[in-house]
Design a protein with these regions (language model features):
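Short beta-strand scaffold segments in enzyme catalytic cores
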Residues: 26-40
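Short, basic/aromatic recognition patches
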Residues: 1-26
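Zn2+-dependent cytidine deaminase-like catalytic core
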Residues: 40-115
Length: 115
């Protein structure tokens, strides 16, 4: 079961990160291990060899991959995905069909926001 206090802190942290994103689609991924934040990623317009390998289009790196590339640890990881609209309301932010297969391989648990 998810600790409500931990969940609230992650939502607040992710929302603060999303406010820094200048684009309309504000996705934030947080990687945790033993309740410690190891890496944070956002959707970015840039290229990376792993993005090409996994079929990303338009030179975009999704927040899951952006966070994973920053994370040095490779086991016991939890992925938390968040998305907020321009009014600060949470929206669906589950991994896309291109991200989901590799996310299921590298993360022990995956959580995402819903409408």
């Amino acid at each position: 079961m998810i600790d409500p206090e931990k969940h609230r802190k992650l939502i607040d942290f992710a929302y603060a990160k999303c406010l820094e994103i200048p684009r309309r689609k504000k996705h934030c991924s947080i990687i945790l291990c033993k309740n410690k934040i190891l890496a944070v990623g956002i959707n970015r317009f840039k290229t990376h060899p792993l993005a090409v390998k996994h079929g990303y289009l338009f030179g975009e790196v999704h927040s899951e991959l952006d966070a994973y590339l920053k994370c040095e640890k490779r086991d016991g990881l939890e992925l938390w995905n968040f998305r907020f609209n321009t009014h600060g309301q949470m929206r669906i932010s589950r991994p896309c069909p291109k991200c989901l297969p590799w996310c299921m391989k590298v993360f022990d648990k995956i959580y995402h926001t819903m409408d």
